[in-house]
Amino acid sequence: MPINSESCPLCKVHSNTIKKEDEDEEDNKTSWIQCSKCKVWYHVHCLDLPTDEIDQIVIYHCPECVPKYGESTYKRKSKRARVSIDYQSLNEGDTFAIDKSSHFHLHNFLNFKGETNINVIDKLTKTYALNTQMEKPILIPQADLSKNGMQLPIEKNEITIDYITDCCGEDTPLEVMDVISQQGISPPWKLKQWREYFKTNEEKRDRIRNVISLEISDVAKLGVDFTRPKCVRDMDVVDRVWIEEDEQKRSKVTKYCLMSVKNSFTDFHIDFGGTSVYYTVLSGAKTFLFFPPTDNNLELYKSWCLEPSQNFIWYPEYTITKNKKKIKPTGGFKVDLQPGDLFIIPSGWIHAVHTPQDSIVIGGNYLTIRDMVMQLKINEIERETKVPTKFRFPMFNKVLWLTAWYYYNHQNEFQSDIGEDEDGNAILTRLIGHLQGHLELSKTNATAKRSIPKTIGKPMVFINKLLAWKEDLYGTAV
């Protein structure tokens, strides 16, 4: 299905008259804030909110929602020296007293019980991933770097906050998340400010904050000298299909440095675009709580995302009525990670993350051809839940056109890249259907039109070639 671009309703930053590269640059520079009621995202500067006010907002109500729900909720300063509490008003005046030293869902997280269901191996290869169809997360404990085709810039225990700051530069802007509100802090911090906070004693930190989006692909030493696991590089479809001569640079989502203080918590989410994730812990520890991407779990997840009070609803206990029966998420379990562990999260898995102690992690995202059906399913959920463009996989549609073009021209690689037991017919059917919808959207949407690569020639002619190829392979038409 086609994507509808999300934009700030108070400005024309994403109007059709602006070039796509300008949109990307603007998104990278702009701070956003989301209304907790209507879920619409706004540019902070369009709202004319004073800079010193932004970090004090706990629950934001946009101008359209203020008449119905009242003014935004701000932090309240506690007069008690030893306990720091936020008071947040919810539906019809209900009030929650929230300890700012930990997220209010953390108790539920820590007490969750479920039978762990992962694959534990010592060497990750493309062959293994395809043979197991990536049905479960994969853990490589204390991974042998050379055996897994991975390389760190220096020893893992030497990758400290000081080393990261030296590599990136202390004036590097940083998106910092406030753990209690699960909102980004505005204005962005500088890395030197984060270093000071990260090195502050736990008891002296005013709030729990988290950094999960520092992309380091082009950072000397830290990113440039880091090599992703070979299996990840072998399966990353963007690596395979992106044309180096393209006027747009490929998306930078392959190498992130995550820095989390003790008791950081990220609520349930699915990684953007249904990407798979590799994750290696350098110091500290992490605990994940997973739910598999079954049809029911994804339906519950989508409904949960649309709840006005989503932040205060514990996803594992969320219920909806389906076929006259109440259903709730099933199959949940936790996984603990320690320094040296390498971890793979398959496409579409719903997860929350807790940090039991200060930690530094390097990880990244990647699309695959074998996960195309799930990736498009997650893309549709993102569209239906109105996830803003800045939080989605960059140039997603362009990547899909290039993927189709590549495999049409390298047909002998298609089955080997999806695995012998994978349903290639379903993959091509879903991919072609998406491209047909996107082509239709491009007739009225300039952004969609720009994302169709010129290298494929006339899009409709190319789609007909794809249909003919699929029919030759499987004897069916879309």
From Swiss-Prot:
PANTHER family: PHD/F-BOX CONTAINING PROTEIN (PTHR23123)
Cleavable signal peptide: none
EC number: 1.14.11.27
Organism: Candida albicans (strain SC5314 / ATCC MYA-2876) (Yeast)
Positions with a binding annotation for substrate: T266, K286
This protein's domain notes: The JmjC domain mediates the demethylation activity.
Gene field: JHD1
Residues the record lists as binding Fe cation: H269, D271, H351
Lineage, highest ranks first: Eukaryota, Fungi, Dikarya, Ascomycota, Saccharomycotina
Protein name, entry field: JmjC domain-containing histone demethylation protein 1
Domain JmjC: 217-383
Pfam families (alphabetical): Cupin_8 (PF13621), JHD (PF17811), PHD (PF00628)
